[in-house]
């Protein structure tokens, strides 16, 4: 679990699926076991409070973004209100959002060339390739993922790349688009 302060009233937590397993959760538990999820969030808020040296009080707005292969991004914003009735009460509003895409980052273009030989038989066509901050990013959208087994893709990609915690919105805004469509075929044509 990684905790990072964003501003004086906001911080973010990145929790991998391995972190969830260590805490006794599966991905499905997040959708079906509300009481244990509340307990998990309470524990995470306590850890964040201790690590960042902040006192959590009042209302907390919690946004949870589930990333297909990566884990969860949790954004917590503390709203300060004049709530003199019960200062020890913490209210959390939770928003769950599951990402419908897979994003992988590569350190070296050679790894992208290598992985395309495994992606080609899967028939993947709509993979976007970006370059940003000395890394390459492959984004597979939800339409592409509905045609093949996600676990197969994750297995192949994890041999050559790392799951990205950078969102597609940030990559699209700040990254340089290298290939927008037929990425696998283009790489095969130019490098094989």
UniProtKB/Swiss-Prot annotation:
Lineage: Bacteria, Bacillati, Bacillota, Bacilli, Bacillales
Protein family: Belongs to the MecA family.
Alphabetized UniProt keyword annotations: Competence
Cross-referenced PANTHER family: ADAPTER PROTEIN MECA, ADAPTER PROTEIN MECA 2
Record function comment: Enables the recognition and targeting of unfolded and aggregated proteins to the ClpC protease or to other proteins involved in proteolysis. Acts negatively in the development of competence by binding ComK and recruiting it to the ClpCP protease. When overexpressed, inhibits sporulation. Also involved in Spx degradation by ClpC.
Identification of the protein by name: Adapter protein MecA
One Pfam family hit: MecA
Any one biological process term the GO annotation gives: establishment of competence for transformation
Species in which this protein is naturally found: Oceanobacillus iheyensis (strain DSM 14371 / CIP 107618 / JCM 11309 / KCTC 3954 / HTE831)
Domain notes: The N-terminal domain has binding sites for ComK and probably for unfolded/aggregated proteins; the C-terminal domain interacts with ClpC.
GO molecular function, a single term: protein-macromolecule adaptor activity
Subunit and interaction comment: Homodimer.
NCBIfam families: PRK02899.1
């Amino acid at each position: 679990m990684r905790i990072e302060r964003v501003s004086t009233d906001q911080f973010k937590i990145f929790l991998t699926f391995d972190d969830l397993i260590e805490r006794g959760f599966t991905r499905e538990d997040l959708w079906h076991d509300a009481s244990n999820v509340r307990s998990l969030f309470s524990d995470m808020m306590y850890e964040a409070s201790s690590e960042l040296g902040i006192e959590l009080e009042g209302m907390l707005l919690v946004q949870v973004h589930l990333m297909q292969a990566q884990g969860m991004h949790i954004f917590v914003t503390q709203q300060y209100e004049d709530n003199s009735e019960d200062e020890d009460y913490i209210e959390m509003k939770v928003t769950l959002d599951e990402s419908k895409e897979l994003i992988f980052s590569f350190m070296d273009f050679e790894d992208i060339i290598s992985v395309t030989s495994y992606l080609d038989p899967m028939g993947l066509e709509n993979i976007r390739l970006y370059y940003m901050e000395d890394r390459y990013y492959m984004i597979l959208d939800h339409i592409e993922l509905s045609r093949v087994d996600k676990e197969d893709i994750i297995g192949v990609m994890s041999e050559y790349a790392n799951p990205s915690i950078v969102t597609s919105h940030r990559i699209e805004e700040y990254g340089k688009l290298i290939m927008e469509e037929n990425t696998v075929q283009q790489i095969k044509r130019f490098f094989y």
